[in-house]
Amino acid sequence: MAQLEYKLVIVGGGGVGKSALTIQLIQNHFIDEYDPTIEDSYRKQVVIDEETCLLDILDTAGQEEYSAMRDQYMRTGQGFVMVYSITSRSSFDEINAFREQILRVKDKDTVPMVLAGNKCDLASERQVTTNEGQELARAFGCPFVETSAKARLNVEECFYGLVREIRKEVIGDKKGGGGKKKKLMGIDRCKLL
């Protein structure tokens, strides 16, 4: 049986810990220095729900000056981890723009996503409540998890949860629908005879 591969993309503002989460998952260690990412790709074989699969994770630039690159990697991603820092209100406020761009580029009403509030080990510096994260995820219709790359808290749950969301979409596509926007509502398509 062929091994399944999942193309995951991690998005969010600069400095929220996207690379730290990814490296913690892939290499089991925490990077504490901030070195802005332009784009890095990581691969790891894992077993999720008794199924061996390969995670192909694209760690993206959060800085606005790299926003032109986003459309390209959003086209190729099957699912997205949207990360904000619980210590940064502005990073939380940016999340909706990332989601809207993903939906626009994918030309779908729904795309597999997980919302992650990172740096939950810094509770004394919290600017975004857990409830606010839960409410936003509920509005998006996606899972929510608070993570800490430093403490390795909910790191696997975040990425594995996204794989489960992708699997749900694949099952939904087989049943019909697939979340694709309907462009020809009420118009009969041409038939070749």
Curated annotation (Swiss-Prot):
It catalyses: GTP + H2O = GDP + phosphate + H(+). Keywords: Cell membrane, GTP-binding, Hydrolase, Lipoprotein, Membrane, Methylation, Nucleotide-binding, Prenylation. GTP binds at residues 12-19, 59-63, 118-121. It is a lipid-anchor. One of its GO terms (molecular function) is GTP binding. Residues 191-193 form a propeptide. The keyword Ribosomal protein does not apply. The keyword Secreted does not apply. A motif (Effector region) lies at residues 34-42. Its main location: membrane. Pfam families: Ras (PF00071). A lipid is attached at C190 (S-geranylgeranyl cysteine). Its EC number is 3.6.5.2. GO terms for cellular component: plasma membrane. GO terms for biological process: signal transduction. It is found in: Cell membrane. InterPro entries: P-loop_NTPase (IPR027417), Small_GTP-bd (IPR005225), Small_GTPase (IPR001806), Small_GTPase_Ras-type (IPR020849). The modification Cysteine methyl ester is found at C190. It comes from the Eukaryota. Belongs to the small GTPase superfamily. Ras family. Ras proteins bind GDP/GTP and possess intrinsic GTPase activity. This is Ras-like protein 2. It comes from Physarum polycephalum (Slime mold).
